[in-house]
């Protein structure tokens, strides 16, 4: 797997192990460091009235031009029987986070129109990185979470706890990321009832003096890597 995505390989490996050595076919359609617009088909961009807004920002040749990667790497496989999609992207849209949720939702719907309307779509919420400007990444994560909460047959895994070095935009613990994605597929696509794949999500909060009491949907208790919480988004 030297030239294949580590996250995707670990995803497939766990599926294979949990499903009794069932052969798992993986298609690697990815290009690192790209924005979401090149992965959206032209019809979706026009229909959602996003084309003019994004054209100037993504002008040029592949992999930056609108729809370029969809045309080259997704459209050629639409006649395959695809069981689902694993998506790990978002960092390149950090500075234009305002429209990410709309574009992500539209892209998923566009792919479903091309493949099939119940296409499962499991994705990774972007991880912390010291190079992100201000609060942009937090706003983008929020939009990713909104898509998972509102669009059927989607699932989001959190990987913020898998970052050992905040100066490295590429988390080193890729096996765990792939396995968390696999757990999401095992639970929702393969109906493995004994697997709990969901990451902690904000349920509610209340202010108590100088404290903010946060309630999450986590199963069990949460732990902090350090003795005190230094960051909260």
Kindly give the residue locations of the regions a language model identified.
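Cell-envelope and extracellular/periplasmic
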Residues: 1-233
């Amino acid at each position: 797997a030297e030239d294949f995505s580590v996250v995707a390989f670990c995803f497939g490996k766990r599926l294979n192990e949990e499903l009794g050595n069932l052969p798992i076919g993986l298609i690697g359609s990815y290009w690192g460091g790209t924005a979401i617009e090149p992965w959206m088909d032209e019809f979706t961009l026009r229909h959602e009235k996003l084309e003019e807004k994004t054209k100037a920002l993504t002008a040029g040749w592949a992999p930056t031009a609108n729809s370029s990667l969809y045309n080259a790497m997704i459209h050629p496989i639409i006649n395959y029987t695809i069981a689902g999609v694993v998506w790990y992207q978002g960092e390149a849209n950090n500075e234009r986070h305002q429209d990410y949720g709309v574009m992500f939702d539209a892209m998923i719907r566009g792919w479903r129109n091309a493949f099939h309307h119940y296409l499962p779509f499991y994705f990774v919420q972007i991880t912390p990185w010291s190079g992100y400007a201000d609060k942009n990444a937090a706003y983008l994560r929020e939009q990713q979470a909104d898509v998972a909460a509102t669009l059927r047959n989607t699932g989001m895994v959190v990987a913020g706890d898998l970052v050992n070095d905040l100066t490295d935009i590429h988390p080193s613990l890729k096996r765990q990321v792939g396995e968390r994605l696999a757990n999401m597929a095992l639970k929702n696509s393969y109906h493995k009832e004994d697997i709990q794949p969901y990451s902690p999500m904000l349920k509610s909060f209340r202010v108590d003096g100088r404290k903010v009491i946060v309630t999450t949907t986590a199963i069990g208790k949460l732990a902090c890597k350090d003795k005190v919480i230094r960051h909260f988004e």
